[in-house]
Amino acid sequence: MSSKLVNSLRLTFLSFLGIVSTSLDAMPAGNPAFPVIPGINVEQKSACAFDLCNSYDVLSALSGNLKLCFCGDYIFSEEAQVKDVPVVTSVTTSGVGPSPTITSTTKNRNFDLVDCSLSANCVAAAFSLPDRTMSAIPLFDASFEVKIGGLKQYYRLPMNAYRDFTSDPLNSESEVTDGLIEVQSNYGFVWDVSLKKVLWKDGVSFVGVGVDYRHASCPIDYIIANSQANPEVFIADSDGKLSLKEWSVCLGLTTYVNDYILPYVAFSVGNVSREAPDNSFKKLEERFTNLKFKVRKITSSHRGNICIGATNYIADNFFYNVEGRWGSQRAVNISGGFQF
């Protein structure tokens, strides 16, 4: 393939990523060449360098290579919704006497997260199987990674997203109150699995794809309800668990810059869902005389992010990676580790 055609394909791919990502949120993509970066080039005795096409590591030559890493993922804001919530828009009272007729008018609404943040810290092990052929479309060049660690969440949501207007009829329109629910968790257990594969390479550039799944269960630290009638109702609850399930698929491109730095750009799409525990909101109900709650899933579907990052080797077989992502999600991912 001519160099002019290759450069045109790279430019087209980068332009496509830039266009489609502006309207769309997902997990970190990582470097598309992650499965084939072996670490140290032993021909350079005094410096670390990328050796993307050949490896002199015995373990890598025989069976692959192993990476042990630390990973931190920090989400500063995220867009998500509680969808199709039946909400009372008006209450009409007719008739006289001790039992008047009360009619409520309802309408389905979507509620957006007002604020959301997430912090995850994990240790990871990744096994990679490089392809030793010079084929542009490799058979192997794949890696499998497992992460375990701790994850903490916080979000604020309009109170009516968790209201239950069906269990007890409202007596007046004044009970159709609005406000905010704040939920903060402690660190809970999180696990994450991912699979990455190089689809195409020419020794300088790589196109890769990745699939990632994350699952977390975090103990509730506190829940705060703010409304017009009740300025602040606070409960602390460590029994309930706030769950998070997330998956994403990414496609990325990386191009060789020098012997130490490998920058990349990727596009990632996926889905996330959060669900608070029923028992925690039952405790919150006990603090109110006229409010009932129903827990609903918070979802962010068909999400997309543009991911830009770089991988750097700063010592023998030691690397670190920094990635930022923008879209419906604003986040930073930092990872580093040793390769064997």
Curated annotation (Swiss-Prot):
It is a multi-pass membrane protein. The keyword Membrane applies. Residues 1-26 form the signal peptide. It is found in: Cell outer membrane. GO terms for molecular function: porin activity; structural molecule activity. The keyword RNA-binding does not apply. Keywords: Cell outer membrane, Ion transport, Membrane, Porin, Signal, Transmembrane, Transmembrane beta strand, Transport. GO terms for biological process: monoatomic ion transport. GO terms for cellular component: cell outer membrane; pore complex. Belongs to the chlamydial OMP family. This is Outer membrane protein B. It comes from Chlamydia muridarum (strain MoPn / Nigg). The gene is ompB.
